UniProtKB/Swiss-Prot annotation:
<dbReference type="InterPro" id="IPR000722">
    <property type="entry name" value="RNA_pol_asu"/>
</dbReference>
<feature type="binding site">
    <location>
        <position position="468"/>
    </location>
    <ligand>
        <name>Mg(2+)</name>
    </ligand>
</feature>
<dbReference type="InterPro" id="IPR006592">
    <property type="entry name" value="RNA_pol_N"/>
</dbReference>
<dbReference type="InterPro" id="IPR007066">
    <property type="entry name" value="RNA_pol_Rpb1_3"/>
</dbReference>
<dbReference type="GO" id="GO:0000428">
    <property type="term" value="C:DNA-directed RNA polymerase complex"/>
</dbReference>
<keyword id="KW-0240">DNA-directed RNA polymerase</keyword>
<dbReference type="InterPro" id="IPR045867">
    <property type="entry name" value="DNA-dir_RpoC_beta_prime"/>
</dbReference>
<keyword id="KW-0238">DNA-binding</keyword>
<comment type="similarity">
    <text>Belongs to the RNA polymerase beta' chain family.</text>
</comment>
<feature type="binding site">
    <location>
        <position position="75"/>
    </location>
    <ligand>
        <name>Zn(2+) 1</name>
    </ligand>
</feature>
<protein>
    <recommendedName>
        <fullName>DNA-directed RNA polymerase subunit Rpo1N</fullName>
        <ecNumber>2.7.7.6</ecNumber>
    </recommendedName>
</protein>
<keyword id="KW-0548">Nucleotidyltransferase</keyword>
<dbReference type="InterPro" id="IPR007080">
    <property type="entry name" value="RNA_pol_Rpb1_1"/>
</dbReference>
<feature type="binding site">
    <location>
        <position position="466"/>
    </location>
    <ligand>
        <name>Mg(2+)</name>
    </ligand>
</feature>
<dbReference type="GO" id="GO:0003899">
    <property type="term" value="F:DNA-directed RNA polymerase activity"/>
</dbReference>
<feature type="binding site">
    <location>
        <position position="152"/>
    </location>
    <ligand>
        <name>Zn(2+) 2</name>
    </ligand>
</feature>
<dbReference type="GO" id="GO:0000287">
    <property type="term" value="F:magnesium ion binding"/>
</dbReference>
């Protein structure tokens, strides 16, 4: 084995500061001139584009390593500063050090006893595998309190810090500004043995290195210039900044050598400090940012590293990849949940490498014959050729109309072709933001016409996708291992159960839910029943009719739906349409809300969101856990198709007339609202008369508002109950709400009865004019309508004042949503970064990458949430039902 092949392990990494000597040692050139190129366009020696620093122009050779563009990595230069300058990145640390050390002897201003005590603690921490530097902060705070140095007895002045890089020495009422040279002198006095106490590793850093006397100049390759369309060169922002630094540095040196007045030297020194500050960080607080001639702020060192667009997050943590596509998404209920519809245009562009074997050679010949423009075809043939020195090289040959016939004849075993994406290929499908595991899953390709990706609506919840213009990404795995891994671990059917709470996250939504209700609560003639069976993809026989009426054979939706259920399924549960009666009538429920499934047959009850809906689907949840994910996928595919078809057969529509309620209902609602307003008026009168009893723990005004909010909230709920009472079973708007397909009865209340009280900052509306919310109300009025109570419903329309209050509530909702999204996004980022190396081990403990135990028992109860049942470890009712049903059958 070659000695360089021996695997090496990094022991530890130490960060230090570059000393002036190190900067000069690693430098290949002293930069002395601000000019970059001469009149002929060649880099000037001693300038910022000096060829010793590396080359970016083809044809030029690096004078340091003799490399050309692409081979020369670039080399550092340096600028000798005329005066020392504070490094803005260490300005706060310098302030802490100046407060903690004696300006005369440089020692930390704590007693010998304290010093020994801290050193002992640090040593103990180090032996125990801890971080000794954590004690430094406590020591710095303690040392800053002393006014006399215990070591030399001299007076230690207090230090005042003005951002970004100014320090003052306070002597009573007077204060003296410390120059960066004076700051450096104090830091130079700190002995090495005290550095450890201050949190500085003196082997790799000294405190005075925080004040710069030499500035490293980055290689040319880090800051390449670009040539514009006009032929002019445009220099990088770092080069612009370095030009400013060199110019001011030269002027400062000339003025010092020429004996210029102190005032001029100080001004130039401050200017040099400003340019070096903005070179390191152009967004530092308290400094005006350096700008381009166009007014654009320069992107300097800190801006290139930090934030979303910085080097770490933009280029290292996240990168652009090949073999991916992105387009708008559309729904397609005819696709399986495992499938994704790929536009033919994309399928012809994205390729899969396939090795030619005796088993697939004929198929590949046909693909090559189609060429690269006709789907399914081949874009490239990869041929291996042996070179003279015996090495193998790969040649990638594009298939064109001129060479495809030749390749049809000459293709042989062992070659690799890059063929078009075809039906059945495995791809990864992703929607951003990727907030959980199911934001990227494996689907099987179905090539379709048009230009959008298509997927089944059941997979919308895990992706949080809708079809109002959302875009999604597809990634094509390029190796057999990757494809196998994606299909085994990431296929959609394997993720029906959410790892968050152990319930189905993939399931029926919207039309599927209301369709299932329509299906299981209706009866169908033979032709309709056959259409439903065919639509769901079943080849089974229809069987005997459920009943015959007037010579017509009828098949119940329940028996048709039963054909989608696996044999052996036994279940009892309450449907979403359940009215939550005081005493459940179970099998005798007049709303058909008690669902019984025996041996895979829907005996009683209707199927709605509680049956196979996303998040709450009891049937779906049971099938996944008892029969496996493949059966669950088959059930979901067939049941949703049947549901949609039943909607198409029966018809399902909603309009403004769904909010129509009879005149007696309207009168009942008006009476309730009148009573609520008079109750509010009574509360106001009691408040003004001083007879209102305050609630426990609240003031009189708070109590008044709580009483009013309670009255108005109850009024809206009561009006909703009235509206619901008069909305029939056939009312499609109410049906959608009751079955859990879309919306809630509160939405219907607001449309048909009353919108209710508008809330701003958790209470009634009080902001506006002095003493009143709007000029339409009397000053000091406290009644319901003057503080945001919207009596009208949406169908009737809002009065101008009501509309204004409604807009206030709506505006707060929008702002709140935007703020919450940003906050939760940032919190998730921090959580992910903190927890990224923590995992559950096979012994049940939770450990990080260093093997340190975080939890002795995973989750304290050793329960895998994805194996739990909606948060419960074991659902005993289900276990009993399963056992009883087994012996009943």
């Amino acid at each position: 084995m070659d000695r360089f092949d021996v695997p090496k392990e990094i022991g530890d990494i130490t960060f230090g500061l570059l000393s002036p000597e190190q900067i000069r040692t690693m430098s290949v050139a002293k930069i002395v001139t601000a000019d970059t190129y001469d009149d002929d366009g060649y880099p000037i020696d001693g300038g910022l584009m000096d060829t010793r620093l590396g080359v970016i122009d083809p044809g030029l050779v690096c004078k340091s390593c003799s490399g050309r563009v692409g081979t020369c990595p670039g080399h550092f230069g340096h600028i000798e500063l005329s005066k020392s300058v504070i490094h803005i990145g260490f300005a706060k640390d310098i302030y802490k050090l100046l407060k903690a050390v004696c300006p005369h002897c440089g020692k930390v201003t704590v007693t010998e006893i304290k010093r020994d005590e801290y050193l002992e603690k640090m040593l103990k921490l180090e032996e125990d595998g801890g971080d000794p530097w954590t004690l430094s902060d406590d020591l710095l705070k303690e040392a800053a309190k002393s006014s006399v140095c215990p070591s030399c007895g001299e007076v230690k002045y207090d230090i005042k810090y003005d951002k970004p890089t100014t320090y003052h020495q306070l002597d009573g009422k007077s204060q003296k500004q410390l120059t960066s040279s004076e700051v450096r002198e104090i830091l130079e006095k700190i002995p090495n043995e005290d550095c450890k106490l201050l949190g500085i590793n003196s082997r790799v850093a000294r405190p005075e290195y925080m004040v710069l006397t030499v500035l490293p100049v980055p290689p040319v390759t880090v800051r390449p210039s670009i040539t514009l369309e006009s032929g002019e060169r445009s220099e990088d922002d770092l080069t612009h900044k370095l030009v400013d630094i060199i110019r001011i540095n030269q002027r400062l040196e000339e003025n010092i050598n020429g004996g210029a007045p102190n005032l001029i030297i100080e001004d130039l020194w401050d200017l040099l400090q400003y340019h070096i500050n903005t070179y390191f960080d152009n967004e530092a607080p308290g400094i005006p940012p350096a700008r381009h001639r166009s007014g654009r702020p320069l992107r300097t060192l800190a801006q290139r590293l930090k934030g979303k667009e910085g080097r770490f997050r933009h280029n290292l943590a996240g990168k652009r990849v090949n073999f991916s596509a992105r387009t708008v998404i559309s729904p397609d209920p005819r696709l399986s949940i495992n499938e994704v519809g790929i536009p033919e245009l994309i399928a012809k562009e994205l390729t899969v490498p396939e090795k030619v074997t005796p088993y697939n050679i004929e198929r590949i010949r046909k693909l090559i014959e189609n060429g690269s423009d006709k789907h399914p075809g081949v874009n490239y043939v990869i041929k291996k050729v042996k070179t003279k020195d015996g090495k193998e090289e790969e040649y990638k040959i594009k298939i064109t109309d001129t060479n495809k016939k030749m390749w049809v004849e000459n293709i042989v075993d062992g070659m690799v072709v890059e063929r078009h994406l075809g039906d059945g290929d495995v791809v990864l499908y992703n929607r951003q933001p990727s907030l959980h595991r199911m934001s990227i899953m494996a689907h099987k390709v179905k090539v379709l016409p048009y230009r959008t990706f298509r997927h089944n609506l059941c997979v919308c919840p895990p992706y949080n996708a809708d079809f109002d213009g959302d875009e999604m990404n597809v990634h094509v795995p390029q190796s057999e291992e990757a494809r196998a891994e994606a299909e085994t671990l990431m296929l959609v059917e394997k993720h029906i159960i959410s790892p968050r709470y152990g319930g189905p996250i993939i399931g029926a939504i919207h039309d599927f839910v209301s369709g299932a209700y329509v299906l299981t609560s209706s009866n169908f003639i033979k032709d309709e029943a056959l259409t439903l069976l065919k639509s769901s993809g079943f080849g089974s026989e229809l069987g005997e009719p459920d009943f015959v009426e007037n010579g017509i054979e009828y098949y119940s939706g329940k028996s048709l739906f039963s054909k989608t259920l696996p044999k052996g399924l036994n279940l009892q549960y309450k449907a979403k349409v359940c009215k939550k009666c005081v005493q459940c009538k179970r099998e005798e429920c007049e709303n058909d809300a008690f669902v019984i499934i025996r041996n895979g047959r829907l005996v009683q009850g209707v199927i709605d969101k509680n049956g196979f809906g996303a998040e709450t689907g009891v049937v779906l949840n049971t099938i996944v856990k008892d029969f496996g994910s493949e059966d669950a996928r088959t059930f979901l595919d067939s049941a949703t198709k049947m549901s949609v078809k039943s909607m198409m057969l029966r018809g399902f529509t909603t309009g403004i007339d769904d909010e129509d309620i009879p005149s007696e209902a309207i009168q009942e609602i008006q009476d309730l609202l009148d009573k609520a307003e008079s109750d509010v008026q009574e509360i106001v009168e009691r408040y003004e008369g001083g007879t209102l009893d305050p609630l426990p723990g609240r003031g009189i005004e708070e109590s008044r508002e709580a009483y009013i909010m309670q009255i108005l909230g109850k009024a809206r709920d009561d009006t909703g109950k009235v509206a619901e009472k008069y909305l029939s079973k056939e009312n499609h708007a109410a049906l959608m709400a009751r079955t859990g397909a879309r919306g809630s009865l509160l939405n219907i209340t607001m449309m048909a009865a009353s919108v209710g009280q508008q809330s701003v900052r958790g209470g009634r509306v009080f902001r506006g004019y002095r003493g009143r919310t709007l000029p339409h109300f009397g000053e000091g009025s406290l009644d319901a309508k003057s503080h945001g109570f919207v009596r009208s419903c949406y169908k009737k329309g809002l009065a101008p004042t009501e509309y204004f209050f409604h807009a206030m509530g709506g505006r707060e909702g929008l702002v709140d949503q935007a703020v919450r999204t940003a906050q939760s996004g940032y919190m998730q980022r921090r959580l992910v970064n903190a927890l990224q190396d923590i995992k559950a081990e096979y012994d049940g403990t939770v450990r990080d990458s260093r093997g340190i135990i975080v939890q002795f028992n995973y989750g304290e109860d050793l329960v895998d949430p994805s194996k739990a049942d909606h948060g419960k470890g074991v659902d005993l009712d289900k276990v009993f039902t399963k056992v009883i049903s087994k012996y009943e059958n």
